[in-house]
Every structure is written in C-alpha cells, then in structure tokens.
Amino acid sequence: MAASSSEVSEMKGVEDSSNTHSEGPRHSEEGMGPVQVVAENLDQPEALQSGPDTTAAPVDSGPKAELAPETTETPVETPETVQATDLSVNPGEDSKTCPSPKEACQEPASRPEVNREATAEQGAEQQSAAPPEPTSEQALQLNTQSDPQPTSQPPPKPPLQAEPPTQENPTTEVLTESTGEKQENGAVVPLQAGDGEEGPAPQPHSPPSTKTPPANGAPPRVLQKLVEEDRIGRAHGGHPGSPRGSLSRHPSSQLAGPGVEGGEGTQKPRDYIILAILSCFCPMWPVNIVAFAYAVMSRNSLQQGDVDGAQRLGRVAKLLSIVALVGGVLIIIASCVINLGVYK
C-alpha cells in the first residue's frame, strides 16, 4: 500500500504538469470543450489503478506539450485548472462536477464572439461617421466650376448708352427759318419785316435738318407750341410790321395765287379799283365814292398778305361799283328821255 500511495503522488505531479501544458490546445479548439477534459481525467485514474506502469502518462504529455506553442489565446483562469485536478483526484464525483466545467468553458467561448461583434459594430460606425474622401469633394468642385449654371450667374450686360436727345420736328424748323425768327433762351422772338410783302407761305418739303437742339435745353414741344401761337396771331392781326390789323375776323382759308410768293394753284383776289374809278363818272356819287374806298382797302390788305380780308373788301367794292354804274346809267337815260320828250 505504501508503494501504491507513492505512485499515486507521482502521478498527481505528472498530471498537474500535463494539465498546465494542455490548457492552451484545450481552449484553442472550441469543439473539444470540457467534455473531453472530463473524459481524459476519468480515464487517467483507471490507468493508475490497473498497475504500477506509469509510462502512459508521459507519452500523452508529449503531444500536448508540442501543441502548446501553436495556441494563440491566453490561458484560461486558474479555477478551471483547479477543477480539472479535483476531477482527476476524485473520479467518482464526475457526475456532480461535469456541469460546472461545461458552463465555464462555454462562457470564454462566447466572449470572443461578443467582442468580435462589438468591434465590427464600432468599425461600421467609424466608417459611417468618417468624412467623405477629399477626391469626391474635389471632383464635385471641378464639376461645378466646369458647368456653371446660366441662371445663377448671368453674363454681365454692357451699360446702356444714353440716347441722344430727340431733335426738333422738321416742320417747326422750316417754319422758323421761313419766318426769320430767332431762338433766345427758349423763347421765340419774331423779326420785323423790312418790306411790306405778303406774309408766310408754305415751303416745299425739305429733308430733315441735322441741327442739334438749342443749348438752353428748352424742349422741342414748347418751341413748337410757341411757333404755332405766333403763326395764328399773324393770321389774325396781320404782319407784325403793319400799322394796323386786317378787317377780317376769321383766319385766311385761301392762300395767295400764283403771282404771290409761295402761292401754288390758289385764286388771287382781283383788284376792283378800276371798276370803282369808272363808277365815279356816274351820278351815284356817294355810292361810287364808297366803292372806290373799299377797292383801295382791298388792295392794301392784299399787299400786307391778308388774302381773306382783301377778298372780302374786294367783294364789297365790286358790289358798290356795280350799283353805282347801273344807277348812274339809269339816271342818265331817264334824264335824256325826260329832256328829249319835253322839248318835242
């Protein structure tokens, strides 16, 4: 019995050394698990009880020791090794202690998986939170620079040039030139006529003048209005140089005839002064004298350019001259008849 007890103590030492060497390969292979460890521990006491031959244990420790360098994981906690030694010492209690090594071995196996999942999730979060690559930003900037939107940045327009001021109406310039007027400080000043010839007459169509507007800055509409007012005043009151206005109350409706300057295709008022002189030889002296006066007035109006007044005065002179002539002839005939009949 003493020899058997010494052998048992030696076997325990060998088993302890073999267990420390076999911890690495036992935990590296997850499929092996604690079940195989328990089976090995149960087989070892049977070998001890069979005989004093102890060569089997060292043979098994060799491969286990060779597998130890291949393991990469750290050895498991010491309580597992303690439990394994307890199982080897007390093989009869394997039914009670088997559940605890399985749970202890399953926990370390599940922990690396949890750690791997946690690291994978952290890596995905870091990749999602990482900023985009600078190459993509540079590509976007190049695209935006190469294709600018026309609506966001329209091309600059050249500044509009100031339009030159509008020129005067050519008709107003023709009127001012024909009547001999001057423009001074935006006002129209008519000139005095040196001769007593007929007044304004329409000028033929002339090309548009290239004169610039007056330097005083008066608008062309004001100048045109002033010219029109001056023309209407002349038609009513005669030429500015005349001593008196015309007897006419309405503006002239007919222009001068071919004999008058500017008259084209219009009827010229006739001069009835000769008829008035003939009527003076008739015995209707008050009538023929008035007819002669109207004939002279009609001639003066025609010389001043008042065609309408000359026509009206000429018609009155004609009527009075005819009345004087007819009346004078009748008086002469009546006197002759009376004188000749009395003498017979």
Swiss-Prot record:
Residues where Phosphothreonine is found: T74, T78
Keyword field: Cell membrane, Cell projection, Cytoplasmic vesicle, Membrane, Methylation, Phosphoprotein, Postsynaptic cell membrane, Synapse, Transmembrane, Transmembrane helix
Parts of the chain on the Cytoplasmic side: 1-272, 294-321
Tissue expression notes: Neuron-specific expression throughout the brain, including hippocampus (at protein level).
Pfam family, one: CD225
Membrane-spanning intervals of the chain: 322-342
Low complexity compositional bias, start-end: 69-82
Region (Disordered): 1-220, 233-265
Membrane topology (Extracellular): 343-344
KW Hydrolase (keyword) present: no
Subunit relationships: Component of the outer core of AMPAR complex. AMPAR complex consists of an inner core made of 4 pore-forming GluA/GRIA proteins (GRIA1, GRIA2, GRIA3 and GRIA4) and 4 major auxiliary subunits arranged in a twofold symmetry. One of the two pairs of distinct binding sites is occupied either by CNIH2, CNIH3 or CACNG2, CACNG3. The other harbors CACNG2, CACNG3, CACNG4, CACNG8 or GSG1L. This inner core of AMPAR complex is complemented by outer core constituents binding directly to the GluA/GRIA proteins at sites distinct from the interaction sites of the inner core constituents.
Recorded family membership: Belongs to the CD225/Dispanin family.
Name of this protein: Proline-rich transmembrane protein 2
Gene assigned in the entry: Prrt2
